Amino acid sequence: MKCKLCLENEDIQESHIIPDAFFRFVKDKNDNVGKYIEVSEAGNKLGQVSYSEKLLCRKCEQNFSKEFESYVIEFTLRNPKNIGVSSKRSTKQITFTNLDYRKLKLFQMSLLWRAAISSLDFYKYVQVEPEILELLRKSLCELTPFEPHILPCFMDRVFLNSPDKNLSLSDLKQSKSSIFNPKKTVSKPLGIEYVTFIFGGFEWRIWLHKCSEFYVHEKKVINPSGVLISPIVNIETNELLRGAGVIARGNELKGKGLK
């Protein structure tokens, strides 16, 4: 079996689509049974795995980790100040400055590409045209990010409840402890098609086509200026989160809740 990225090396490693750090974040310090909850029509259950499979060779896996994964983990889960990123929160949005465009864009591209080629059920709804997958593969292999308007990713900051000025560390951690199966959405009236991931306290909404330069200029997607504006959303205002809550509650009523 050859590496799915470079198509050459055969020392294939276990690769995580959503990096393992995001799953470990929601487990306890002793790495006991997973604390995150999987919600599906089959029922609610505690997750215990971080969904990996053999995809990349050791060299490509290490390149991903070194070039952008470690950076994004620090930005989302730990302390953005450690990588020089500043943030300013208002009631409706968070403005991040001094982000590394190359690293964040490559991470977004790798997320979509790996999820789309995965054989795991967790990612079964991520479907991308072969031509796009090949463009992603080549660019990721060369570690060259797309332009901001190509396969743009809109990042909403997700909280369980609307945050106030005195947000506690516990509330902050809780806001980053949700991981959802990615979902593909097609809106024919609006002419858009996108895949949504939720993990690390963000909704990552990746369009499967180009976007208007308006979104780039307004800092709605990551761009070379390093400024990104993330709207603040919560369960009540987020369709995917609200839908998962309805399914979870329905499972409980049917006797398919957590055992």
Language-model features: locations:
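Mixed-charge, polar/low-complexity N-terminal
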Residues: Y36-E38, G43, Q93, S178-I179, ...
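C-terminal, charged low-complexity interaction regions
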Residues: F122-K259
